[in-house]
Amino acid sequence: MAKHLFTSESVSEGHPDKIADQISDAVLDAILQQDPKARVACETYVKTGMVLVGGEITTSAWVDIEEITRNTVREIGYVHSDMGFDANSCAVLSAIGKQSPDINQGVDRADPLEQGAGDQGLMFGYATNETDVLMPAPVTYAHRLVQRQAEVRKNGTLPWLRPDAKSQVTFQYDDGKIVGIDAVVLSTQHAEDIDQKSLQEAVMEEIIKPILPSEWLNTSTKFFINPTGRFVIGGPMGDCGLTGRKIIVDTYGGMARHGGGAFSGKDPSKVDRSAAYAARYVAKNIVAAGLADRCEIQVSYAIGVAEPTSIMVETFGTEKVPAEQLILLVREFFDLRPYGLIQMLDLLHPIYKETAAYGHFGRENFPWEKTDKAQLLRDAAGLK
């Protein structure tokens, strides 16, 4: 493979779309805390001074959607009208209905193992050995930059930072291996009284340098810090936000394919979410086992049907065992039926709000990031 560049981006927890994702998943978590078998599809819209929470929810639980919304916005850091959005005074509107009984009859079964998929669709999972978390480097470091922005904002290191921020990192590859970072973009919302020069210096010293490995930076690396020169108006005042609008940020930064389904606000019966997590789990264990350097899994479903309609394994020529054997290993060691994968990954718990910012993959505290089947796969493949 010739030399090439690859770019991925991320956004902070204060980005409007991510506010929406976090509210949707906070509602989901609150419901799952009381009713693990709830059916939840929660969508959120945010704009200056208001939040609209809608969707289809069938549950025995009662949750205070207004309180959950305000607490989520408050934790993110929008607590004053000067920021254009205030957790204490914004309007919170609710438009919640129940999940269609037509869908329910296709999902619920007397035998849990025969639980049908909540919808048709195709999902992808991916892993690569180019980072320690078996994720693509561009999106991994883009996430870490905006995580660091939130950290120094919240701990008072840079008190003039505001919640909205975006990052973008362009990596240089040679023959498929990382050789450097070509460009870094970091735009952060800020208070009115900080000048551009001071902001750029502080962002470089407190955010960029602590995160990006120095061996990948050189004199030709380009840095774009707040390149418009001003970013005071941000968050929902600058742009409206919607649940599910950052699906590439949420996954692999464009390095792998995407089936199109968003994650946040959906309970695990929705294979858009749970099967994408399972596909990541499969791909990561294959790479961790040393069966391939890169692995992409596709799985697909028909609504109301338990068995996947297809499973595909792509290793981009990096496989250490035949591709046909990899498919057999996946079918032997991973139950990709909806109920099976929910049990395999223990998904009926309130673990989702944390996923809703800084990527659903590559953070070791999530169950789909375990590599507990790597040795089993390696032994079954006959690798020493």
Curated annotation (Swiss-Prot):
Q: In which pathway does it act?
A: Amino-acid biosynthesis; S-adenosyl-L-methionine biosynthesis; S-adenosyl-L-methionine from L-methionine: step 1/1
A GO molecular function assigned to this protein is: ATP binding
Cofactor dependence is on: Mg(2+); K(+)
Q: How is the cofactor bound?
A: Binds 2 divalent ions per subunit.
Q: Which UniProt keywords apply?
A: ATP-binding, Cytoplasm, Magnesium, Metal-binding, Nucleotide-binding, One-carbon metabolism, Potassium, Transferase
Q: Give the coiled coil ranges.
A: none
> Main site of residence?
cytoplasm
CDD domains given in the database record? S-AdoMet_synt (cd18079)
Positions of Mg(2+) binding: D17
Q: Where is this region: Flexible loop?
A: 99-109
| Record GO biological process | one-carbon metabolic process; S-adenosylmethionine biosynthetic process
Q: Does the keyword Metal-binding apply?
A: yes
Tell me its EC number(s), please: 2.5.1.6
Q: Which residues bind L-methionine?
A: E56, Q99, D239, K270
| Catalytic activity line of the entry | L-methionine + ATP + H2O = S-adenosyl-L-methionine + phosphate + diphosphate
SUPFAM superfamilies in UniProt:
S-adenosylmethionine synthetase (SSF55973)
Chain residues that bind K(+): E43
Protein residues bound to ATP: H15, D164, A165, K166, R230, F231, D239, R245, K246, A262, K266
> Where does the record place it?
Cytoplasm
Kindly state one GO CC term assigned in the UniProt record: cytoplasm
Q: Does the keyword Plastid apply?
A: no
Enzyme class, top EC level, equals: transferase
Q: How does it assemble?
A: Homotetramer; dimer of dimers.
Q: Which family does it belong to?
A: Belongs to the AdoMet synthase family.
Q: What does this protein do?
A: Catalyzes the formation of S-adenosylmethionine (AdoMet) from methionine and ATP. The overall synthetic reaction is composed of two sequential steps, AdoMet formation and the subsequent tripolyphosphate hydrolysis which occurs prior to release of AdoMet from the enzyme.
**How is this protein named in the record?**
S-adenosylmethionine synthase
To which species is this protein native?
Salmonella agona (strain SL483)
Gene giving rise to this polypeptide: metK
